[in-house]
Amino acid sequence: MAPTHVLRCCQRGLAWIPVIFIALVVCWSYYAYVVELCLLVYLVVFHLSFVMFVWSYWKTIFTKPANPSKEFCLPKSEKEQYEKEQRPETQQEILKKVATSLPLYTRTGAGAIRYCDRCQVIKPDRCHHCSACDMCVLKMDHHCPWVNNCVGFSNYKFFILFLTYSLVYCLFIAASVLQYFIKFWTSDLPESHAKFHVLFLFFVAAMFCISILSLFTYHLWLVGKNRSTIEAFRAPVFRNGPDKNGFSLGFSKNIAQVFGDEKKYWLLPVFTSQGDGLSFPTRLVTIDPEQPTECLQPGGAISSLIIVEYCFCKQAKKKKTDE
């Protein structure tokens, strides 16, 4: 038991290495830019991007991943019955009985209720178990080693802003240092130890800029589609089958799902995402017969989008029958 505990502690310690590396690079970039270059015109923009970058990075790292609430845990009697039962079919019947009162619309690939034996909870839609954090995370996107944290419902907006401001930070440094970088190679830069900071500052900023740009673009595309990284690779399965666009509500509504309704808060690393992370509006055209209609929309109201599409589909079928 003791060696396992020591190993686990070592793994947790090593997991902070990428975060410490980024922190050291940022601290050095601050010294190289502010102390060695120290141009007043640049410092205002630099500090603005620096503060927003550090703020969003901090929020991404230290915002605790959201977990399923107690209502998704099996009641004591059903839990005992589930653990005693050996047959998967009977276990599924127990889960289905409990799930009827929950806002669940996604299933496993085999059409079963998604249950985490590790956390002993019925998984809400878009929830997945993270082996690194050893917990189920609401609307899990991925586990990021660069923040040593799971990126999910509670901090996905912060992660997007972290990518945004880190890209702005690197672009600004690379652009403003470029002239000194050129002077370095043309031997026009005065001889001092600062010239080496200029050289490496440009290389590091350009390198991070290129790597962040692709990740930033990809996650903007995911936000526009209202998908997580996991859902992009494996489409969520509904009762009618897999649907990669199952949670897509249209571009503007998809953006609001992550950033909220009030645009004045979009660029600030404060939580404004819609919903509670336990249930999500969908673009389903048919209502799940096994779920109560009041669960279709977080807050107890049926999604207007679902009603319109459902009624339209019903009227179209009736018209076709009359003809």
UniProtKB/Swiss-Prot annotation:
The active site is at residue 144. InterPro entries: Palmitoyltrfase_DHHC, PFA4/ZDH16/20/ERF2-like. One of its GO terms (biological process) is protein palmitoylation. The keyword Lipid metabolism does not apply. Residues 36-41, 179-195 are lumenal. GO terms for molecular function: metal ion binding; protein-cysteine S-myristoyltransferase activity; protein-cysteine S-palmitoyltransferase activity; protein-cysteine S-stearoyltransferase activity. Its main location: Golgi. Keywords: Acyltransferase, Cell membrane, Cytoplasm, Endoplasmic reticulum, Golgi apparatus, Lipoprotein, Membrane, Metal-binding, Palmitate, Phosphoprotein, Transferase, Transmembrane, Transmembrane helix, Zinc. GO terms for cellular component: endoplasmic reticulum membrane; endoplasmic reticulum-Golgi intermediate compartment membrane; Golgi membrane; perinuclear region of cytoplasm; plasma membrane. It comes from the Eukaryota. Its EC number is 2.3.1.225, 2.3.1.-. Residues 1-14, 63-157, 220-323 are cytoplasmic. It catalyses: L-cysteinyl-[protein] + hexadecanoyl-CoA = S-hexadecanoyl-L-cysteinyl-[protein] + CoA; L-cysteinyl-[protein] + tetradecanoyl-CoA = S-tetradecanoyl-L-cysteinyl-[protein] + CoA; L-cysteinyl-[protein] + octadecanoyl-CoA = S-octadecanoyl-L-cysteinyl-[protein] + CoA. Residues 114-164 form the DHHC domain. It is found in: Golgi apparatus membrane; Cell membrane; Cytoplasm, Perinuclear region; Endoplasmic reticulum membrane. It is a multi-pass membrane protein. Pfam families: DHHC (PF01529). The chain crosses the membrane at residues 15-35, 42-62, 158-178, 196-219. Belongs to the DHHC palmitoyltransferase family. Palmitoyltransferase that could catalyze the addition of palmitate onto various protein substrates. Catalyzes palmitoylation of Cys residues on protein substrates and has a preference for acyl-CoA with C16 fatty acid chains but may also utilize acyl-CoA with C14 and C18 fatty acid chains. PANTHER family: PALMITOYLTRANSFERASE ZDHHC16 (PTHR12246). This is Palmitoyltransferase ZDHHC20-B.
